[in-house]
Structure formats: structure tokens, C-alpha cells
């Protein structure tokens, strides 16, 4: 499974690790992803999603239905 947030689409960022001597080596900055069971009122059940912590915070204010509609995902498949 890809390391990508299922609601926002967040994924890893390519960056540089810069040493004290200013040498640069490529490094992946991964998104902070967590498995989360979210209550889905319309389906009357829990839905298990892999979400970024930013998405979890947004989920509390917007709600699961609004975010799923924006992402274009069908919650019946989860």
C-alpha cells in the first residue's frame, strides 16, 4: 500500500539532508500517517482509513462525509 493519506492525498516530499559542512544528500520526508477508525454515521459503522495527522484534525471540524466527498472516495469500500 502506498504511503499516502486516503482523504487528502498527502505523500512524501523530496528534500535534502544538509550536513554541517553543507553537503546535501537526498532524503524523503514522509507524511505522518496513522491508521484511524472513524465513525461513519450514514453507514452506521466504523471505517478504517490511513490518514495524515493534519487530516485527522481537519476531520474533527469538517466531518467524514464532507472530506470523503472532496476526495471523491466511496466509504462503502472501506
From Swiss-Prot:
Keywords: Ribonucleoprotein, Ribosomal protein. One of its GO terms (cellular component) is ribosome. Belongs to the bacterial ribosomal protein bL28 family. The lineage of its organism: Bacteria, Bacillati, Cyanobacteriota, Cyanophyceae, Synechococcales. GO terms for molecular function: structural constituent of ribosome. This is Large ribosomal subunit protein bL28. InterPro entries: Ribosomal_bL28 (IPR026569), Ribosomal_bL28/bL31-like_sf (IPR034704), Ribosomal_bL28_bact-type (IPR001383), Ribosomal_bL28_sf (IPR037147). GO terms for biological process: translation. The keyword Ribosomal protein applies.
Amino acid at each position: 500500500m502506498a504511503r499516502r493519506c486516503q482523504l487528502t492525498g498527502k505523500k512524501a516530499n523530496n528534500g535534502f539532508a544538509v550536513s554541517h559542512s553543507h553537503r546535501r544528500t537526498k532524503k524523503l520526508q514522509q507524511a505522518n500517517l496513522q491508521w484511524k477508525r472513524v465513525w461513519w454515521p450514514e453507514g452506521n459503522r466504523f471505517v478504517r482509513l490511513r490518514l495524515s495527522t493534519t487530516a485527522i484534525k481537519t476531520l474533527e471540524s469538517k466531518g467524514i462525509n464532507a472530506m470523503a466527498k472532496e476526495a471523491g472516495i466511496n466509504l462503502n469500500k472501506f
